[in-house]
Design a protein with these regions (language model features):
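Helical hairpin unit composed of two closely spaced alpha helices linked by a short loop
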Residues: 3-47
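C-terminal regions of RecA-like/P-loop NTPase motor modules
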Residues: 1-5, 32-42, 53-147
Length: 147
C-alpha cells in the first residue's frame, strides 16, 4: 500500500549526522529536510513541536512565535495548529487553533475532550448547553483533569 502519512513526535528529538552550533540551526535544518521529504515522497508530514516557555509565563493561547527553537518551523509549515485548553477552566472544551494555513483559512474549532478515552469529540454549538447539563449530572466519563 505504501506510505500515506509521516508523523514526527517531536521535532526537537530528531538528531542529525551534522553537528550544529545551536539547536536553532539544527531545528531549521530538520524542518527544511522534512519539507523536502514530504515533497519527495508525496505524503503529508505532521511534525509535533515543543513550545517555548513564554506561553506559560504569558498565559492564554499559544502563538506562532511560541514554537520552540526556530522560526523556520513557522516558515516551512503549510499548516500550523495548536491544541489549547485553559488549565484554570472546569470545562472539557479544547480549542484547535489554526494559526497558519498556506492554502486556506485560519481560525478556531472547539472540541470536547474526553479524558477517559483520550479523544476529542466534535460538538455543534447548539449541543453545548445539552452537553454541559449532561456532563454535570450524569457521570458520563468526561474528566477535565486528564488533559
Amino acid at each position: 500500500h505504501g506510505l500515506g502519512l509521516l508523523i514526527i513526535d517531536y521535532l526537537q528529538l530528531i538528531t542529525t549526522t551534522k553537528n550544529f552550533d545551536s539547536m536553532v540551526n539544527q531545528v531549521t535544518e530538520i524542518s527544511r529536510s522534512l519539507k523536502g521529504l514530504a515533497r519527495e515522497l508525496n505524503v503529508p508530514v505532521i511534525a509535533l513541536s515543543q513550545l517555548n516557555r513564554s506561553v506559560e509565563t504569558r498565559g492564554g493561547r499559544p502563538r506562532l512565535s511560541d514554537l520552540r527553537d526556530s522560526g523556520s518551523i513557522e516558515q516551512d509549515a503549510d499548516v500550523v495548529m495548536f491544541i489549547h485548553r485553559d488549565k484554570e477552566s472546569e470545562s472539557q472544551i479544547a480549542e484547535i487553533l489554526i494559526e497558519k494555513h498556506r492554502n486556506g483559512a485560519t481560525g478556531m474549532v472547539e472540541l470536547v475532550f474526553d479524558g477517559s478515552k483520550t479523544t476529542f469529540i466534535e460538538v455543534e454549538k447548539r449541543d453545548f448547553a445539552d452537553f454541559a447539563a449532561d456532563a454535570a449530572g450524569s457521570g458520563n466519563g468526561f474528566v477535565d483533569d486528564n488533559f
